[in-house]
Amino acid sequence: MKLTFLGAGAWGTALASHAAATNDVVLWGRDPAQLGAIAATHENAAYLPGVKLSARLAVQADFELAVAHAADDPDGIVVVATPVAGLREMTRRLAARSARPVSMLWLCKGFEAGTHLLPHQMVRAELDAAGRTEGFAYGVLSGPSFAREVAQGLPCALTVAGTEPSLADRAQAAFHHHAMRIYGSDDLTGVEVGGAVKNVLAIATGASDGLGLGLNARAALVTRGLAEMTRLGLALGGRVETFMGLAGVGDLILTATGDLSRNRKVGQQLASGQSLEQVLAGLGHVAEGVRCAQAVAELAATHGIEMPIARAVCAVLFDGLSAADAVAQLLQRDARDE
């Protein structure tokens, strides 16, 4: 199968390298020099230093040629591996092509700043505006996965949710091999809400661990955080079983407890007394939990949903509340039934 990956960050590169073992894969990025280095060394030194990539992975600096590689193949898939903020641009560029409709998957997790739209709602809006909804199949690939481990060939399991069963089938054919398992779903909303909210909750568990509050506190935050994720997801149209699966509790556990998690690191460093500006400056890469914390808090308020952990994270990030005071406020909440 022909696959094109748009975005040469850690996750796009890792998944492209995995897919290249059994597929014809092209990787596109905005920096031609970076792509040249990947081709020459089989390493993405900027995002996955020290990890050897598949020698079968090809790179292409020309956007149109890269897209045509997969889009002109009836079974091909274009995989958008940008953050949420770049998804609209990629969709517009794909919709602007005069050629046949594209099958596309995205890897980003979060809500759009300002609109609070989920990724599939953003994509649908762009396709509607371009008059290109006919024939376009699209969906999301999500679940518990650190890019470095995927690039190293370590086992993982992911969920694909799309607008058409055929897209999920093709995604399974492309990625379900070696150490990776792919499970299908038709709950686009649930899969995307799980991927967005878990990043916010991971900041909370990172802060708790940074304050030295122990494993009991971490388990409580993960469990009660899952309840918050589920409440919001159901209000937005997701299904409860999705939040009990890989895209929900699975991704939450990994991101909240794994030391490769950028969002967890944000919480740990905030707990140490660093400002948000200092934390982000030192991080070097995107932490989507920071970007979507405000959206989660505002969506909860709009729908009348109780999400005290997510609200506390938002207050620490943007309102000057210290991590220690946020924990104190959570502990002072009235007793209630689970």
From Swiss-Prot:
Q: Which PROSITE patterns does the annotation name? A: NAD_G3PDH
Enzyme class, first EC level, given as a word: oxidoreductase
Show the active-site residues: 198 (proton acceptor)
Kindly state which reaction or reactions the protein catalyses. sn-glycerol 3-phosphate + NAD(+) = dihydroxyacetone phosphate + NADH + H(+); sn-glycerol 3-phosphate + NADP(+) = dihydroxyacetone phosphate + NADPH + H(+)
GO molecular function terms noted in the UniProt entry: glycerol-3-phosphate dehydrogenase [NAD(P)+] activity; NAD binding
Q: What is its EC number?
A: 1.1.1.94
The pathway entry for this protein reads as: Membrane lipid metabolism; glycerophospholipid metabolism
Could you tell me the Gene Ontology terms of the biological process aspect for this record? carbohydrate metabolic process; glycerol-3-phosphate biosynthetic process; glycerol-3-phosphate catabolic process; glycerophospholipid metabolic process; phospholipid biosynthetic process
An example GO CC term for this entry is: cytosol
Residue sites binding NADPH per the record: 11, 30, 109, 147, 262, 286, 288
**A Pfam family this chain is assigned to:** NAD_Gly3P_dh_C
Keyword annotations for this protein?
Cytoplasm, Lipid biosynthesis, Lipid metabolism, NAD, NADP, Nucleotide-binding, Oxidoreductase, Phospholipid biosynthesis, Phospholipid metabolism
The answer, when asked if Signal is one of the entry's keywords, is no
Coarse class of the primary localization is: cytoplasm
**Which residues make up the binding site for sn-glycerol 3-phosphate?**
109, 143, 145, 198, 251, 261-263
Give the protein family.
Answer: Belongs to the NAD-dependent glycerol-3-phosphate dehydrogenase family.
Function as written in the Swiss-Prot or TrEMBL entry: Catalyzes the reduction of the glycolytic intermediate dihydroxyacetone phosphate (DHAP) to sn-glycerol 3-phosphate (G3P), the key precursor for phospholipid synthesis.
Q: What is this protein called?
A: Glycerol-3-phosphate dehydrogenase [NAD(P)+]
What is the protein's species of origin?
Cupriavidus taiwanensis (strain DSM 17343 / BCRC 17206 / CCUG 44338 / CIP 107171 / LMG 19424 / R1) (Ralstonia taiwanensis (strain LMG 19424))
Q: Which gene encodes it?
A: gpsA
